[in-house]
Amino acid sequence: MSIKEFAKNAREAYFTLPNGDKIPSIGLGTWRSGKDETKNAVCAALKAGYRHIDTAHIYGNEKEIGEGIRESGVPRTDIWVTSKLWCNAHRAGLVPLALEKTLQDLNLEYIDAYLIHWPFALLSGPEELPRNEKGELIYEDVPIEETWQAMEELLETGKVRYIGISNFNNEYLDRVLKIAKVKPTIHQMELHPYLPQTEYLEKHKKLQIHVSAYSPLANQNDAYNSDISKLIEHKTLVDIANARGEGITPANIAISWAVKRGTSVLPKSVNESRIVSNFLYIPLTDKEMEAINNIGVVRRFSHGKFAPKPMFVGLQDGTPKQTHA
């Protein structure tokens, strides 16, 4: 198959949600995308064929994302937009206000998915990272059940189509499922060949909760300050990419691996050429998938180190090291 055909695959690759609706398989991640870069990145992605844009209030670039959407000329109804509730708005009365702020910044009437970004609460109020006189973060005891029930009420407003979660461990996931009238449609988490989380992924498949993978290129983002070689330089991915022919990159292989596993995937870039080159779906063979699955490196890069307690104990590589907000 040619690059052109792989790009066509990417445009046509969707996952079906339990109600029959579809979520695009490859989206654009925007964490740490600067305000001056975001609009052009979003516009370039949509013009290249992406139909899935991921953002969050804490990223501070929702206004620019909205501008990029409008500048692209792609109809709003053709685009899946995900955003996330930040930790300082977990109180029930603040959840709808936080959504309104996101909609105002995006200049959209609705978003497709709204996720709880992290399962713990910071002090309610205008400060995104409230600190005491010692410089320590100030947390607030807001039960996740309260926040989830407030999220459920958003569905009645027509301003959000689906609700979900991000960075939840088994404990928080099970607490939500125990009281949910509407269970999460999506769980966004760190997933890549260095952190496949196969057992946790299978649990979500059984629950019919779609998993969306952030940081699919693992330690490509310099914010992770990784002490191991970059995933996209790993010999296994390089060899598969080379065997696939000119124009295929190790990043394409990592992204296609994620899609083949049944997860939507959110590679981040502000470089137009990389945005375009990332948007390929290569149906990997069972042999190629097995080779990637057997890489043997296990490393989590997003530990939520700013959380009040370790977030991923009991999950693959749950020892805190780095922070991802």
Swiss-Prot record:
One of its GO terms (molecular function) is aldose reductase (NADPH) activity. Its main location: cytoplasm. The keyword Calcium does not apply. GO terms for biological process: cellular detoxification of aldehyde. Keywords: Cytoplasm, Nucleus, Oxidoreductase. Substrate binds at residue 117. InterPro entries: AKR, Aldo/ket_reductase_CS, NADP_OxRdtase_dom, NADP_OxRdtase_dom_sf. The active site is at residue 59. GO terms for cellular component: cytosol; nucleus. It is found in: Cytoplasm; Nucleus. It is an enzyme of class 1 (oxidoreductase). Its EC number is 1.-.-.-. The record marks 84 as: Lowers pKa of active site Tyr. PROSITE patterns: ALDOKETO_REDUCTASE_1, ALDOKETO_REDUCTASE_2. Belongs to the aldo/keto reductase family. PANTHER family: ALDO/KETO REDUCTASE. This is Uncharacterized oxidoreductase C8E4.04. It comes from Schizosaccharomyces pombe (strain 972 / ATCC 24843) (Fission yeast).
